[in-house]
Amino acid sequence: MHVGELLKALEELGLKDNTVVMYSTDNGPHYNTWPDAGTTPFRSEKNSNWEGAYRVPAFVRWPGKFPAGTTLNGIVSHEDWLPTFAAIAGDTTVKERLLKGTTINGRSYRNHLDGYNQLDYLSGKVKESPRNEFWYVNDDAQIVAARYQDWKVVFLENRGQAFGVWREPFVELRAPLIFNLRRDPFEKAQHNSNTYNDWWLDRAFVLVPIQGLAAKFLMTMKDYPPSQTPGAFNLSKIEEQLRNAGGGK
């Protein structure tokens, strides 16, 4: 169903003013299926560590609640929609309750939600997004990069091109790459600037707070470990998963 048809149906049913509509996509384009995959001005594509893999458009409509025709430039993640939609439905404490453990509809849950309630930001009650950070996690569950405000630090780099991003490994960098996404949103300075390395050295201090945030984030995995391991095409990883599932046999 096209978006326009869905919006028209909501209006015909008298639900337009009482329905939140959010339109987005789960990841950046997959170029080898162009033109169906779309395109992006940002660097690289799905399954990389670059902005083209993670940064996507999002449109939200809630007549009378969210200001129309407004562009917001703060950091918002898809992880934020669960606590945001819960807040819209009247539950503003779901994140805190899940952290401690709670019962919902007769079922017990204890989960760590990384999302932020963006309701006040989307409605215009506050000017800044409550989210200052974003963790770039690949499909192997590796943290390949981190963002704090305008700064992005790349720990693992996928150097593949086109379908090669699926074949090439993520390379661990001894010295992470640094980008300022306000001044260099397309992450070109690394290759285009004659003075990138000098600029990097003058801003290496950025690594300290981001490494501290990364350590804090990773500590949450101790009390709230991942519930499952990601799938893999690599035979050694598949063998490891089978061995773990069989208790080492």
Regions found by a protein language model. Give the residues of each.
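Solvent-exposed, polar/charged alpha-helical surfaces in well-ordered, non-transmembrane soluble domains
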Residues: 1-4, 8, 83, 87, ...
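Metal-dependent active-site segment of extracytoplasmic phospho-/sulfohydrolases and closely related
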Residues: 1-34
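Structural scaffold positions in well-ordered secondary structure
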Residues: 3, 21-22, 57, 81, ...
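Sec-exported extracytoplasmic/periplasmic mature domains
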Residues: 8-15, 86-94, 123, 215-222
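Short, solvent-exposed turn/loop segments enriched in Gly/Ser/Thr/Pro and often Arg
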Residues: 23-31, 136-141, 150, 224-236
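C-terminal cap/loop subdomain of S1 sulfatases and analogous C-terminal strand-loop tails that border
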Residues: 29-51, 66-70, 74, 79-188
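Short glycine- and hydrophobic/aromatic-rich loop-to-beta-strand nucleating segment
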Residues: 58-60, 76
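Long, internal low-complexity/basic segments
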Residues: 148, 153, 159-160, 167-177, ...
